[in-house]
Amino acid sequence: MTARSRGRAVPSYKASLVRDGLKGTRIGILRQAYERTPPANNPSAVTVDPDIVKVFATAIDDLKSAGAEIVDPARVELPPAAQGGGCRGFKYDINDYLKTRGARAPVHTLDEIIASGKFHESIRGRLESSNRGTPQGPDSDACKADAAYRTAFGAAVTKTMDDLKLDAFVYPTWSFPPQLVGQTAQGSAGDNSQVYSPRSGFPAINVPMGFTRGNTLPAGMTMLGRAWSEAALIKLAYAYEQATRHRRPAPIR
């Protein structure tokens, strides 16, 4: 991705700060990003909070009021998932990076990181899981299959945008309001930021879209664009932000 970005640098994003930047645009509602079927072992599970649904509906109306044409739904026909368990490249990548640090590094492998115990206990399970098995580099069959899947995923997103003449997709960033300190019931469920942008490699930007729980807990909306469309996304996000002014700084106590 870094190599492919050569020659695409934008000198300044200041020109993207246009208050009426949503006028004349076409925005697709990517409902499949957050409207999920409950798992078979828990068919009554709530997969998106009603407050989020309500706030997002208002956000769509706000986009319309700011001059955007809404395409709803805008569905992406995704490719079948890569087979073989996916690319488990973390162990390879971290060990390869630590080699470049030489004697300056206090640790030289993922094994040594785990043995040191110098990390937050909450990530121990992930570190140990990543350390199992043979490191998979970019030339491994699993990582090649994963790279091919990501390319196909990005092509599917682009095709939908081309077919529907979209400037961006939008969807709730999270399907649930923020948890309060000490709350653990929801865990990390409902994070909608881990699929469409990471798997396609395309840019996305998050903007405040309003409040839930009696106007107390914030909610965000993600705008997903084409490859290299950062300037266009900033223009859309800025126009939406200026039209709604949802951001409310928390009081300092």
Which residues does each predicted region cover?
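Small-aliphatic-rich amphipathic alpha-helix that forms the alpha element of a beta-alpha
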Residues: 78, 184-208
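Short, surface-exposed loop/helix-turn segments at secondary-structure junctions
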Residues: 44-45, 141-142, 176-195
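Acidic helix-start/capping segments at beta-turn-to-alpha-helix junctions
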Residues: 74-87
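General small-molecule cofactor/ligand-binding pocket signal
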Residues: 69-74, 205
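Short helix-loop capping/hinge segments that flank enzyme active sites or metal/cofactor-binding pockets
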Residues: 16-42, 88-158, 206-220
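Structural helix-boundary/capping segments
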Residues: 1-36, 45, 57, 62-64, ...
